[in-house]
């Protein structure tokens, strides 16, 4: 995987209250590209953070339907990945994951 693809796969951290609780169990949540696969996400995290990844779980979040002045509209959906690191590995520079 080339360096350019690494930065296109991981779009950024997804920080929520649920993600903060998951970080306590060595699981970190990232927003990822719609076409990203589990092996790509694993390689991207290992290349970017230099940590060993134990597993990756991926899910698609559907956009919400919202009413507008002109009828119904649809918000954009996204894809997120729960990345579990190997035992003893943590991401210190992961903001908000204390």
From Swiss-Prot:
<dbReference type="GO" id="GO:0019843">
    <property type="term" value="F:rRNA binding"/>
</dbReference>
<keyword id="KW-0699">rRNA-binding</keyword>
<comment type="similarity">
    <text>Belongs to the universal ribosomal protein uL23 family.</text>
</comment>
<keyword id="KW-0689">Ribosomal protein</keyword>
<dbReference type="InterPro" id="IPR012677">
    <property type="entry name" value="Nucleotide-bd_a/b_plait_sf"/>
</dbReference>
<dbReference type="InterPro" id="IPR001014">
    <property type="entry name" value="Ribosomal_uL23_CS"/>
</dbReference>
<dbReference type="GO" id="GO:1990904">
    <property type="term" value="C:ribonucleoprotein complex"/>
</dbReference>
<comment type="subunit">
    <text>Part of the 50S ribosomal subunit. Contacts protein L29, and trigger factor when it is bound to the ribosome.</text>
</comment>
<dbReference type="InterPro" id="IPR013025">
    <property type="entry name" value="Ribosomal_uL23-like"/>
</dbReference>
<dbReference type="InterPro" id="IPR012678">
    <property type="entry name" value="Ribosomal_uL23/eL15/eS24_sf"/>
</dbReference>
<dbReference type="Pfam" id="PF00276">
    <property type="entry name" value="Ribosomal_L23"/>
</dbReference>
<dbReference type="GO" id="GO:0003735">
    <property type="term" value="F:structural constituent of ribosome"/>
</dbReference>
<dbReference type="GO" id="GO:0005840">
    <property type="term" value="C:ribosome"/>
</dbReference>
<protein>
    <recommendedName>
        <fullName>Large ribosomal subunit protein uL23</fullName>
    </recommendedName>
</protein>
<comment type="function">
    <text>One of the early assembly proteins it binds 23S rRNA. One of the proteins that surrounds the polypeptide exit tunnel on the outside of the ribosome. Forms the main docking site for trigger factor binding to the ribosome.</text>
</comment>
<keyword id="KW-0687">Ribonucleoprotein</keyword>
<keyword id="KW-0694">RNA-binding</keyword>
<dbReference type="GO" id="GO:0006412">
    <property type="term" value="P:translation"/>
</dbReference>
